[in-house]
Amino acid sequence: MYRIEFSRKAAKFYKRVDAVTVGRINNTLEKLEENPFGLPNTKHLKAEFIGSCRIRIGNIRIIYSVNDSEKIVYIEVIGFRGDVYKK
């Protein structure tokens, strides 16, 4: 089982969204703890996010990377589709 860690930016978004969205994100994070590689709607990213993956939850995106040796899933960014890929 993997451990979830949030970046500041991801934690900030997580704290300010509504309860329904938090529930959807929590459901996905529980699945990521079990298996960060085998979820549907997951895609390996390119360009500036190389080495990271993206999971889609409706119009929300979670960008994360996995450290297999330490069993950590690091949540880099959580946000709406239009905002998550901006710097």
Where are these regions (language model features)?
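A short, surface-exposed loop/turn module that caps and links secondary-structure elements
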Residues: 30-54
